[in-house]
Amino acid sequence: MLPKNYDPNEIEPKWQKYWLEEKIYKYRLDENKPSYAIDTPPPFTSGTLHLGHVLSHTWIDIIARYKRMRGYNVLFPQGFDNHGLPTELKVEKEFGITKDQPEEFLKKCVEWTWQAIEAMRKQFIRIGYSADWDLEYHTMDDWYKAAVQRSLLEFYKKGLIYREEHPVYWCPKCRTSLAKAEVGYVEEEGYLYYIKLPLADGSGYIPIATTRPELMPACVAVFVHPDDERYKHLVGKKVKLPIFEREVPILADEDVDPNFGTGAVYNCTYGDEQDIVWQKRYNLPVIIVINEDGTMNENAGPYAGLKIEEARKKIAEDLEKMGLLYKKEKIKHRVLRHTERSSCMAPIELLPKKQWFIKVKDLIDEIIKVAKEINWYPEDMFLRLKDWAESMDWDWVISRQRVFGTPFPFWVCKNGHIIPAREEDLPVDPRFDKPPVDKCPVCGAEIEPVTDVLDCWVDSSITPLIITKWHEAIKGDEEAKKWFEHNFPTALRPQGTDIIRTWAFYTILRTYVLTGKKPWKDIVINGMVAGPDGRKMSKSYGNVVSPEEVIPKYGADALRLWTALAPPGEDHPFKWETVDYNYRFLQKVWNIYRFAERHIKDFDYEKYRDVELEPLDKWILSRLHRIIKFATEELERYRFNLITRELITFIWHEVADDYIEMIKYRLYGEDEESKLKAKVALYELLYNVMLLLAPFVPHITEEIYHAIFKEKIGEKSVHLLSWPEYREDRIDEEAEKIGELARKIVSEMRKYKNSHGLPLNAKLKHVAIYALDSYERLKLIERDIAGTMNIERLEIVKGEPHLEERIVEVKPNYKNIGPKYGKLVPRIVQYLRENAESIVREIKEKGKAEFEVEGKKVELTKEDITVRKEVFSEGEKVETSVVDDVVIVFF
């Protein structure tokens, strides 16, 4: 029996424990069922879930639960992305250990990560997440690293991995190279410096504009637009760099924007991506002036050792003293920063480094072609990936100068030859393990270990292969082959908008190269979570809300409904009032089933399911089955927001406020046949509503199932039942019109009782309902209206009522007539009382009424009086209400 009060903190942990103990969500390969494998995002092991995780993973959970109910063999694992700089920083801070002790450092990284995993797994379970935890994976596991390394060996065999010096995105704060996907432009305030560069022949100056005067020692050319009349005559000449006394050429190129600054810019190696393009296009020299730590090197001359910002300020001061800096303009411009990590956000430098690359640019067209074969939800998210792919300037930098990461399965010799690991030795760590050979097999040179580790996206970009056991299948394992063939390509990749250009793009690339296939059939994209104020959640804004603040107060199910209300692909603000509303809705659901329990728990629905029902029963079941159809269509498209709103509205208003209230008199009445029909409809309605709600709010529906339905049905969990069956024979448009009419009439009668201070169960002695077109429908529900509203005498009359409106009182507006007529006011009041109808008629016809009081002329307009009218029917005073073509007369 359901307890009196809904307490999510009581019921939710109970069912979470039950699901784990009973292995309700255990995956068993069943080749007789259609596969549905979900390539779930492995969150970075920070130790805590934020609301973004709750939103994305609740969406995934809704899909998994729904697909299980549809009869799919749902493969639903969950992994954790372990490697990365944040863990290294945490270990350095908490344990006081440095990367100079790599073996000990790695042990501490693993130790800290396990603690984070345990905490996050508990949080996942607390939101009702139904993954099969026996399939949990971690990117730091040896078998996972072996799979990653095996994938790289395959890439190497295909000639897709190489090592060379190339300008890379470098974070001076994190001291590592980054992929393009890890950096982004941030608009901020800065300065544009206008500098006169002397021509080498002494004939004058060319003015350039730059935001980075500190890069002057790295200047290798000055560029102008070929059609710029101001500078055409200077192309081919040289400038002499002030301070550094070095000559560089003036060149013309169409990439120059003549409207920016002075229309002339200097090319430094490297200030931005355009500098790289020009340097390669014109085979210009490379001069590097910035160290890995963000200080100026010896090539900066007198500015060596200064930090970048210090050098910028000092060189600007020196140029100003020389009379060459003639303007400093405050501007808004875009600065390239380490945007992937909000705790860093340091400006990025472009430094040439020996790095490892995966060839991507040559595969762009193929990647886009494969991406097109995938169903994107929403569709326009495909364009984000396409635009990103087409904008790539160079290949994917996969090496990172860190410690805690998957090692490269390579050694190198001093001549640059690559020595791959043997497949049977994987996983290997060249930092600690011996190479497969003593000397380079190509040139005989000494072999050195590759000490870099892999970009984290190299780990996570093979998750669809990991969960489908590709790494075991390619070794010849027969069981793994079956698993792989049944589940790959996976059915779904769920992820956020923020990682389309990283996780989605790299996964398509990697799985296509390794298998020749797309990684998934569908991809569904959720937006980001904003704070209650609509801005991005940030500690600096003070608008961060954690799941731990919400769940103890409202429970996981109420929070899950908030996630389900998020529109596909759009950002979704967290709103306390929304969660509160959801909680009150769940209380309403609880009360519905508490009421119904005594009527349907022991009822034999199967015996009577096909009896001829009454009009209101047909109405509510027609509405139910329309919603079953709509819910199925929406969930197949991975759209939750519209069906969630529809379900809440339907259950709260049509089911609770209307239908149940309109059948109570039948359930408690003496007409056994009518009572039985009401129970048939109520059972079918509430059983299916429970199933519709189950993927969204799994805890409350499990409690309801065990209290009311389990004894008869026998299945261990509501989540092992089948999705509601849509019955076309239940759709009845005429019944829906009748039901809607009943709702409106009952609503008007409730308003009448409320306006008279009457309780809703108060008896009404006499009500007449007049109708023309709706007469026949009203006759069918006459007993329902009378029973619901407790009407002693209800008449349904075809036609229009004979109503007479009478003026019963006319009162003066004292604020108006008081100042005008003073002592005459009492006599005016008496006159109005005696001549009410004629006064009102005269004002209506002439706009004013004129009469004399004590010999003085009085003039009144409609602003001077208040008229009270009453309606009479057959001489008896009545009140009326109108609904469509129906007039309700209350006697």
Swiss-Prot record:
SUPFAM superfamilies: Anticodon-binding domain of a subclass of class I aminoacyl-tRNA synthetases, Nucleotidylyl transferase, ValRS/IleRS/LeuRS editing domain. CDD domains: Anticodon_Ia_Val (cd07962), ValRS_core (cd00817). A motif ('KMSKS' region) lies at residues 536-540. PROSITE patterns: AA_TRNA_LIGASE_I. Gene3D superfamilies: 3.30.720.200, HUPs (3.40.50.620), Isoleucyl-tRNA Synthetase, Domain 1 (1.10.730.10), Valyl/Leucyl/Isoleucyl-tRNA synthetase, editing domain (3.90.740.10). It is found in: Cytoplasm. It catalyses: tRNA(Val) + L-valine + ATP = L-valyl-tRNA(Val) + AMP + diphosphate. The keyword Transmembrane does not apply. InterPro entries: aa-tRNA-synth_I_CS (IPR001412), aa-tRNA-synth_Ia (IPR002300), Anticodon_Ia_Val (IPR033705), M/V/L/I-tRNA-synth_anticd-bd (IPR013155), Rossmann-like_a/b/a_fold (IPR014729), tRNAsynth_Ia_anticodon-bd (IPR009080), Val/Leu/Ile-tRNA-synth_edit (IPR009008), Valine-tRNA_ligase_type_2 (IPR022874). A motif ('HIGH' region) lies at residues 43-53. Its EC number is 6.1.1.9. GO terms for biological process: valyl-tRNA aminoacylation. GO terms for cellular component: cytosol. Keywords: Aminoacyl-tRNA synthetase, ATP-binding, Cytoplasm, Ligase, Nucleotide-binding, Protein biosynthesis. ATP binds at residue 539. PANTHER family: VALINE--TRNA LIGASE, CHLOROPLASTIC_MITOCHONDRIAL 2, VALYL-TRNA SYNTHETASES. Catalyzes the attachment of valine to tRNA(Val). As ValRS can inadvertently accommodate and process structurally similar amino acids such as threonine, to avoid such errors, it has a 'posttransfer' editing activity that hydrolyzes mischarged Thr-tRNA(Val) in a tRNA-dependent manner. ValRS has two distinct active sites: one for aminoacylation and one for editing. The misactivated threonine is translocated from the active site to the editing site. Belongs to the class-I aminoacyl-tRNA synthetase family. ValS type 2 subfamily. This is Valine--tRNA ligase.
